[in-house]
């Protein structure tokens, strides 16, 4: 039984070139739905060398206050999709887009691990139930 599956972007699903954190958060936000207000969840968006979307995966779902992200699962999906870049994203149901020290530590750990595989962690984004978000790349925290 598979807990989570890689979602290939279908031919009728628009492939987009992601060049900014705002474009990334808008693209990823569509996968959350109403649960963004209740559960903390984590997704990864996989991109090719031209920063075009090639797939996404929900890698974790927790409770109101947190979720566990296993870097090995992130690496597995990145490798399986042959992605050149990954954007990691999770939400804060509280509505506070500020990264916690744990968010920053996890993002740096993901970046280091993916770099060993020649895969770039392009950003780590925190979404809220409103349109607010934080990009660790924009903050220089990656």
Report each predicted region and the residues it spans.
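Alpha-helix N-cap recognition
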Residues: 19-23
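Active-site-proximal loop/helix of nucleotide/amide-processing enzymes and allied scaffolds
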Residues: 1-9, 30, 48-50, 64-142
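Short loop/turn motifs at secondary-structure junctions and domain boundaries
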Residues: 35-38
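Short loop/turn microsegments at loop-to-beta-strand junctions
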Residues: 41-43, 122
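Short Pro/Gly-enriched beta-strand edge/turn motifs at strand-loop
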Residues: 24-30
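Glycine-rich phosphate/pyrophosphate-binding loop shared by adenosine-nucleotide-utilizing enzymes
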Residues: 54
């Amino acid at each position: 039984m598979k807990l989570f599956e890689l979602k290939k972007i279908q031919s009728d699903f628009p492939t987009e070139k992601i060049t900014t954190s705002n474009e990334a958060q808008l693209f990823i936000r569509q996968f959350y739905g109403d649960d963004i207000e209740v559960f903390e969840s984590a997704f990864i968006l996989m991109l090719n060398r031209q920063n075009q979307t090639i797939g996404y995966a929900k890698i974790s779902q927790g409770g109101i206050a947190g979720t566990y992200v296993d870097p090995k699962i992130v690496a597995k999906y990145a490798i399986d999709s042959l992605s050149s870049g990954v954007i990691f994203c999770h939400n804060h149901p509280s509505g506070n887009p500020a990264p916690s020290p744990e968010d920053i530590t996890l993002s740096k750990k993901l970046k280091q691990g993916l770099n060993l595989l020649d895969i770039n962690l392009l950003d780590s984004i925190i979404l809220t139930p409103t349109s607010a978000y934080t990009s660790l790349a924009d903050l220089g925290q990656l």
